[in-house]
UniProtKB/Swiss-Prot annotation:
Signal peptide feature range: 1-36
Protein name, entry field: Quinone-reactive Ni/Fe-hydrogenase small chain
Species whose genome carries this gene: Wolinella succinogenes (strain ATCC 29543 / DSM 1740 / CCUG 13145 / JCM 31913 / LMG 7466 / NCTC 11488 / FDC 602W)
Entry-linked PROSITE patterns: TAT
Annotated [4Fe-4S] cluster 1 binding sites: C53, C56, C153, C186
Entry annotated with the keyword Hydrolase: no
Binding site for [4Fe-4S] cluster 2: H224, C227, C252, C258
GO MF entry, a single one: electron transfer activity
Enzyme Commission numbers on file: 1.12.5.1
Bilayer disposition of the protein: Peripheral membrane protein
GO annotation terms (biological process): anaerobic respiration
Keywords, ordered alphabetically: 3Fe-4S, 4Fe-4S, Cell membrane, Iron, Iron-sulfur, Membrane, Metal-binding, Oxidoreductase, Signal
Length: 354
């Protein structure tokens, strides 16, 4: 079946292996992941657009090995997606209603974009009847088997919710009373999007989540924990300004605004554009785009957060001041640890000899 659709079995299994690892499953699950993907056309997906830039859809379209055309449309049965579907106007609205009715209680709903709510619903209307985005979201959510908010706009409101939030843009979770899994990012990795669908196919349940309803398998660790420049941070080697010698040598970007220590995501592990790169690799710090209200709380993007948001363990010193000392402190702690280990080893040997 794969060969008929122009997909090499080796490429497909390579993709399945990568998805298995990404979901933190043992390698023995790879054949099961592959089988789930092959059977995934039984799981209809409806994708709605709200107030957004379509960046999350752009990310999805860059899924690789197999690509979006062969994997998503052939195996996951994408029933409705305004960016890639041919229908428009009345026909598009008919297709949506048909999918909701035909797959009632069985489809996965994915929503991209913040949603003007309350008395401001009219700021976003969709389709030939001028239905508000909030009405569309509530209607499609009612009979969904699982609901995913794709991107930070749908998860937390997005940049259109920035103060003073003139359109009262809200996350999907505040528009529907159904459980919502948030997949934030601006945009999220295509593998974080597809991985959640595969998790649902494999286990028939939603993934475990953190306090902000983000899947733990994707958002369980900080950018800082997985960053390839973490060693530079620990050594106290920082870029002082863009273009300086430290920037050329790949030093830590914390002092020029990187929000990696405060941001939970797996960008450094998965990267973007078919695993090509990610912001820190390209020379710019993380802006914290998978965190709630990052548009208001993480700026200015080229300056450290310091002590404005987060208390530290350093007697009130801002994180930017701490960065000056952290390298020396950690190196000293490491030296103490090495010495302690040596003493302990000698004691154990003496005990064994006696």
């Amino acid at each position: 079946m794969l060969e008929e659709k122009g997909i090499e079995r080796r490429d497909f299994m390579k993709w399945a292996g990568a998805m298995t690892a990404m979901l933190s499953l043992p390698a023995t699950f790879t054949p099961l992941t592959a089988k789930a993907a092959e059977l995934a056309d039984r799981l209809p997906v409806i994708w709605l657009h709200m107030a957004e830039c379509t960046g999350c859809s752009e990310s999805l379209l860059r899924t690789d090995g197999p690509g979006i055309d062969s994997l998503i449309f052939d195996y996951i049965s994408l029933e409705y997606h305004e960016t890639v579907m041919a229908a428009a106007g009345w026909q598009a609205e008919h297709n949506l209603e048909h999918a909701i009715e035909k797959y009632k209680g069985r489809y996965v709903l994915m929503v991209e974009g913040g949603i003007p709510a309350g008395s401001s619903e009219f700021y976003l209307t969709v389709g030939p009847h001028g239905t508000t985005g909030a009405e569309h979201a509530r209607h499609a959510s009612a009979n969904a088997a699982a609901i995913f908010a794709i991107g930070s706009c749908s998860s937390f409101g997005g940049v259109q919710a920035a103060r003073p939030n003139p359109t009262n843009a809200q996350p999907l979770s505040k528009v529907t009373n159904k459980p919502v899994i948030n997949v934030p990012g601006c945009p999220p990795s295509e593998k974080n999007i597809v991985g959640n669908v595969l998790h649902f196919i494999l286990f028939g349940t939603l993934p475990s989540v953190d306090a902000f309803n983000r899947p733990m398998w994707a958002y369980g660790l900080r950018i800082h924990d997985l960053c390839e420049r973490r060693g530079r941070f620990d050594a106290g080697e920082f870029v002082q300004e863009f273009g300086d010698e430290g920037a050329k040598k790949g030093y830590c970007l914390y002092k020029v605004g990187c929000k990696g220590p405060y941001t939970f995501n797996n960008c450094s592990k998965l990267r973007f554009n078919q695993h090509t790169s990610w912001p820190v690799q390209a020379g710019h710090g993380c802006i914290g785009c998978s965190e709630p209200d990052f548009w208001d709380t993480m700026g200015p993007f080229e300056e450290p957060v310091a002590n404005r948001l987060y208390a530290t363990a350093f007697d009130g010193l801002g994180a930017d001041k701490t960065a000056d000392k952290i390298g020396i402190t950690l190196l000293a702690a490491t030296a103490v640890g090495v010495a302690a280990h040596a003493v302990l080893s000698m004691m154990v040997k003496d005990k064994e000899n006696n």
